[in-house]
From Swiss-Prot:
NAD(+) binds at residues 78-79, 151-152, 162, 179, 181, 192-197, 252. GO terms for cellular component: cytoplasm. It catalyses: NAD(+) + ATP = ADP + NADP(+) + H(+). The active site is at 78 (proton acceptor). Its EC number is 2.7.1.23. One of its GO terms (molecular function) is ATP binding. It comes from Coxiella burnetii (strain RSA 493 / Nine Mile phase I). It comes from the Bacteria. This is NAD kinase. Involved in the regulation of the intracellular balance of NAD and NADP, and is a key enzyme in the biosynthesis of NADP. Catalyzes specifically the phosphorylation on 2'-hydroxyl of the adenosine moiety of NAD to yield NADP. Keywords: ATP-binding, Cytoplasm, Kinase, NAD, NADP, Nucleotide-binding, Transferase. SUPFAM superfamilies: NAD kinase/diacylglycerol kinase-like.
């Protein structure tokens, strides 16, 4: 859901950035100084405090940001915002992105236009609610791993480059058996990421849907399928596999799953509250990021 909001304003701002990304320390420092000039209280997440001089500012562990801040500003690319979402969503802390990455589907504001933040802090912004996925890996009656994903839950080959055989169930109804290099279960947010390179459809962020995208399937008739986001997806790894595939959430963690194990994916109970400037337009973003502005050459 996308809505223009005139309030509340933001007064306690937490800053986060990923170390090792070019330009992030400089932008964090400039952002800190700008927020101080606006008489906002600035809180530094612990890693951000290592990158800039924040000797006079409060430093807070990532998992405690909500106790001190009412907005989290992330400096970096889409990967940095994905990482921040894993921290902010369970705390229900709104997130705004400053783009220092390559694409910037999720990080709207260029580093040379930090003055746009002033209007946002004063309560003039668009708030977009994006859902996440929750993935659970089970072997027998044991929960091996559990995690959330803003983009996707992905089944990947193991250490050997072999196809994986698995069964797909939706709401306990059998859908199909597949042999493929893997499977991407994507949100609308993730539909312009890994799933897009796998041939998946672009889903508008306001759709309450997710897509299942097979990776290099053995059967040419295997195609992506879009399902209701309220569905529960179960992937059963065939006992016939002689290698253990991996399950990944947003590419951040990777867990091995034995043949016979199950991967359950469903909608996570907390969404991401993503903050945009008032002139944000999703289709403008698609045109710019996917080079749709280029006209086809005349023959």
């Amino acid at each position: 859901m996308l809505k223009i909001v005139s309030k509340p304003s933001f007064n306690r701002i937490a800053l986060m950035g990923r170390e090792g990304v070019e330009g992030v320390p400089e932008t964090l420092a400039a952002l800190k100084d700008y927020l101080v000039s606006l008489n906002r209280e600035v809180i530094l997440e612990e890693n951000a405090a290592h990158m800039i001089d924040g000797s006079r500012l409060l430093t807070v562990p990532a998992n405690d940001l909500k106790k001190k801040a009412d907005l989290l500003i992330v400096v970096g690319g889409d990967g940095s915002l994905l990482n921040a979402a894993h921290i902010a969503v369970p705390q229900q802390l709104p997130v705004l992105g400053i783009n220092r990455g390559r694409l910037g589907f999720l990080t709207d504001i260029p580093p040379n236009e930090l003055t746009q933040i002033s209007d946002i802090l004063d309560g003039h912004y668009r708030e977009e609610v994006r859902f996440l996925l929750e993935g659970t890996v089970e072997e027998g009656d044991e929960i091996v791993a559990q995690g959330i994903a803003l983009n996707d839950i992905v089944l990947l080959p193991g250490n050997a480059p072999k196809m994986i055989e698995f069964d797909i169930f939706i709401n306990d109804e059998f859908v199909c058996n597949q042999r493929a290099d893997g499977l991407i279960i994507t949100t609308p947010t993730g539909s312009t990421a890994y799933a897009l390179s796998g041939g998946g459809p672009i889903l508008h962020p306001q759709l309450n849907a997710m897509a299942l995208v097979p990776m290099f399937p053995h059967t040419l008739s295997s195609r992506p399928i879009v399902v209701d986001a309220e569905s529960q997806i179960k992937i059963t790894i065939s006992p016939e596999n002689d290698v253990s595939p991996y399950v990944s959430n947003d590419g951040q963690e990777r867990v091995s799953i034995k043949p016979g194990g199950n991967v359950y994916t469903r909608k996570y109970h907390y969404p991401l509250h993503l903050i945009h400037p008032t002139d944000y337009n999703y289709y403008d973003t698609l045109r710019r990021k996917l080079d749709w502005e280029k006209r086809a050459a005349k023959v």
